[in-house]
A protein has these predicted regions:
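PLP-dependent amino-acid enzyme catalytic core
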Residues: 1-311
Length: 311
């Protein structure tokens, strides 16, 4: 609050079981399956959080589950997904390539695809987050939502704009993967190449068709953040709130801290996930300390001879 000039209320979805909001949509979708669909099992593609949500929900419902994850997925997320009992298939360089493999598996096995975001039931379940915000903070002015495929933003938009159209909903994307913003700017779905970002959870090349239509009609604005801004927000959360939030989850707060767009307003950034690789976390802590002038690395070139350090 002191840093941004806004009154900030954090929506801690990273404290959900499996570490993100994704369990909401996954569990609701799986609960609606018919007996025949349950027998054939489910398959999903995900970089990590949706994978864990589907795997955990499938375990609760005793349904066979296959998850296709990119080959570069976080080892921690892969291990957690397997830990919930899912069969993990590593395929592709990104979500889109994993999705193609998931469709192939569905065709050959008869399994039901649980889409990460482009599904009306998934969208509806994520929208409950918006209802919870309105119920707990009826005079909220703005909500900041990380956007990858758009399921979370679409659900929250439907819920919030129905209850109070005056509440602004701002989507936040990585500058390296602005697929939804580019799609809105052109008026049609766009597929982008994307670049490197620490925020793997929102690195989606093509938004969903359903999510695009909802966001196009209802979103107030989409803004972009870079990795340095995200890392700064993560470090701030660790130090001030004692909260470990993954890069994608910190995107909304990153924009608030770096741009300070809403002085005097009551705002809610949704911290949508907390599943982060420990090696990456260590790098982020080191960079945060260095940026704040609290850690210095010194590199010294020494000759390979006895007494070189003394000299």
């Amino acid at each position: 609050t002191q840093i941004t000039g806004s009154t900030i209320y954090l929506k801690n979805e990273f404290e959900q079981k499996t570490g993100s909001f994704k369990l909401r949509g996954a569990y609701y979708k799986i609960k609606t399956l018919s007996e025949e669909e349950r027998k054939n099992g489910v398959v999903a593609a995900s970089a990590g959080n949706h994978a864990q949500g589907v795997a955990y929900a499938s375990a609760l419902e005793k349904i066979n589950c296959t998850i296709v994850m990119p080959k570069n997925a976080s080892p921690a997320k892969v291990a957690a997904t397997r830990g919930y009992g899912a069969t993990v298939v590593l395929e592709g360089k990104n979500y889109d390539e994993s999705w193609i493999k998931a469709q192939e598996i569905a065709k050959t096995t008869g399994a039901t695809i649980i889409h990460a975001f482009d599904d009306s039931q998934i969208i509806a379940a994520q929208g409950v987050i918006g209802l919870e915000i309105i119920e707990q903070l009826s005079d909220v002015d703005e909500i900041y939502v990380p956007i990858g495929g758009g399921g979370l933003a679409a659900g929250i938009l439907v819920a919030i704009k129905d209850k109070n159209p005056n509440v602004k909903v701002i989507g936040v994307e990585s500058k390296s993967f602005p697929s939804m913003k580019k799609s809105l700017d052109s008026g049609k779905l766009e597929t982008i190449e994307g670049g490197f970002t620490v925020a793997d959870g929102i690195s989606v090349r093509t938004p969903g068709e359903q999510t695009f239509e909802i966001i196009k009609d209802k979103i107030d604005e989409i803004v972009l953040v870079d990795d340095d801004e995200i890392i700064n927000a993560m470090f701030l959360l660790m130090e001030r709130s004692k909260s470990v939030v993954e890069p994608a989850g910190a995107a909304g707060l990153a924009y608030l801290v770096s741009k300070k767009p809403s002085p005097g307003k009551k705002v809610v950034p949704i911290l949508c996930g907390g599943n982060i690789d420990m090696y990456l976390l260590g790098q982020i802590v080191a960079k945060g300390l260095a940026t704040m002038g609290r850690m210095v690395k010194i590199f010294i070139l020494l000759k390979d001879k006895p007494g070189a350090l003394k000299e």
